């Protein structure tokens, strides 16, 4: 990801919150295999684990955390991961595997949009030296992936049980807002028949990514002058759409942050 200084976000807690607010990541792996493509990507919702002890919180900028997810075994990417584990098990007795090469997980923000040059109310009439662009936000995580796919292993069962419960809880409460009280109560995994859940668990694999680097980008017209940014905000607000209002809000927030530096 191209990171101009004006667009880059390096504050780890903010990037972690971005992931929690936008947990659907795109996992990309590069696994050499005679049976599957080298490069594969899948959309996977992730749970982010970050240190929660006082000592670790003080070092949160140095501790990006861990991402947990699961993939259907029928997914070709999962099959490549299982193939790699099988080759590893031929040499060891381990029921899990951390791949030696990095993987990449990309998280996109909730709003992105084309930006017309007509929004730039200072530069366009003054010089005409403006071109279209696209505003968006994203966070990418690099790290080492561990695969849990031996359905007979107790370690795999425990990982998957925790994963599906934590993911459902986060999605129901933080994303849907089903917190009880005046709001609806959340759906829980225990609401479904236990044998049904156990059957589904046999058809998924678990993945855990130990994050080694987090990078964030908010490309929201910060590179433009104040007058042009004001035009961008007005232009998106006049669209009268949810996406337009979201972009306008972020352009203002990011512009204010730039001006304060």
UniProtKB/Swiss-Prot annotation:
Classification via Pfam families: FMN_bind_2
Gene3D superfamilies the UniProt entry points to: Electron Transport, Fmn-binding Protein, Chain A (2.30.110.10)
InterPro entries found in the cross-reference section: Split_barrel_FMN-bd, TR_PAI2-type
Superkingdom: Eukaryota
Family affiliation: Belongs to the PaiB family.
Name used for this protein in its record: Uncharacterized protein AFUA_5G13800
Source organism per UniProt: Aspergillus fumigatus (strain ATCC MYA-4609 / CBS 101355 / FGSC A1100 / Af293)
């Amino acid at each position: 990801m191209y990171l101009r200084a004006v667009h880059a976000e390096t504050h780890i807690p903010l990037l972690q919150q971005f992931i929690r607010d936008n947990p659907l990541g795109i996992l990309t792996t590069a696994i050499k295999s005679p049976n599957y493509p080298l490069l594969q990507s899948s959309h996977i919702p992730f749970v982010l684990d970050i240190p929660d002890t006082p000592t670790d919180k003080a070092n949160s900028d140095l501790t990006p955390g861990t991402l947990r997810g699961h993939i259907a075994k029928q997914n070709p990417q999962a099959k490549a991961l299982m193939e790699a584990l099988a080759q590893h098990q031929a040499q060891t007795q381990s029921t899990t595997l951390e791949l030696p090469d990095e993987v990449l997980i990309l998280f996109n923000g909730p709003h992105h949009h084309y930006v017309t040059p007509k929004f730039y109310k200072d530069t366009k009439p003054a010089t005409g030296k403006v071109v279209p662009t696209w505003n968006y936000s994203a966070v990418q995580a690099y790290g080492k992936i561990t695969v849990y796919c031996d359905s007979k292993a107790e370690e795999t069962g425990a990982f998957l049980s925790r994963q599906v419960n934590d993911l459902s809880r986060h999605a129901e409460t933080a994303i849907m807002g089903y917190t009880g009280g005046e709001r609806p109560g959340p759906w829980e995994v225990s609401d479904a028949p236990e044998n049904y859940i156990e059957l589904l668990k046999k058809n998924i694999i678990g993945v855990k990514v130990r994050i080694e680097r987090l990078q964030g980008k908010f490309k929201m017209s910060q590179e433009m002058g104040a007058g042009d940014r004001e035009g961008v905000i007005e232009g998106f607000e006049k669209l009268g759409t949810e996406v337009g209002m979201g972009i306008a809000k972020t352009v203002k927030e990011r512009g204010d942050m730039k001006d304060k530096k």
